[in-house]
């Protein structure tokens, strides 16, 4: 059995103790699920979906809490505190996520949020994040066609528009003239491929193109008119008031 640090794993309960449950971690040995995370009614033999990380003493432990992001993800996270070693991000777990100074583009400030990539440090085997997200974006040719639906994470405002991360893998750009509503760093929205350039760069639009866009707009307009007609019909006239 192979476990994945920094990700959700389904593991079997093999032992119950006063301070929690031990899970079968295969070659990694038994992994503690502290008592505060043990679901009510859980018993030996049950399988649980747990997130694996290192505690404050660098021991492999499990939790049934779901973090805001997992290893391999890009996310928009807030700085909880800083010290002489780096910044620590709130990612929904008791132990905050470390960003060493070498992984910061600009010195991170407490209370501010940043787009980061989560990974396991090869040297220390610690979970950490990096604000130097470019190095983690794929340089492969994107497998998209014009009109394909994608999920984007808004990354950075530029003179041309907004840089976005497409499907947690590729870099894309929403041009200013394609914006029909405000975007903000950290937004996750549904979008569409406008163009795949020969160099692999992606142009993104927030609305469907061609006939589908016309059909969608027509449906929205119809619903809007029907809603307004209903309000007009049901609203009291001045004489009734």
Model-predicted segments: where are they?
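Short boundary/loop segments of OB/S1/cold-shock single-stranded nucleic-acid-binding domains
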Residues: 1-4, 56-73, 132-145, 177-181
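Flexible glycine-rich surface loops and low-complexity tracts that mediate binding to linear polymers
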Residues: 11-13, 45-56, 77-79, 112-123, ...
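Short aromatic-glycine-enriched beta-strand elements
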Residues: 19-22, 85-88, 160-163
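Beta-strand/loop nucleic-acid-binding surfaces
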Residues: 29-41, 96-107, 171-182
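Short amphipathic alpha-helical interface segments
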Residues: 155, 217-232
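Long, low-complexity, charged/polar intrinsically disordered regions in eukaryotic proteins
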Residues: 175-210
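Short alpha-helical segments that sit at the start of domains
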Residues: 205-223
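Conserved small/polar residues in nucleotide/adenosyl-binding loops
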Residues: 233-238
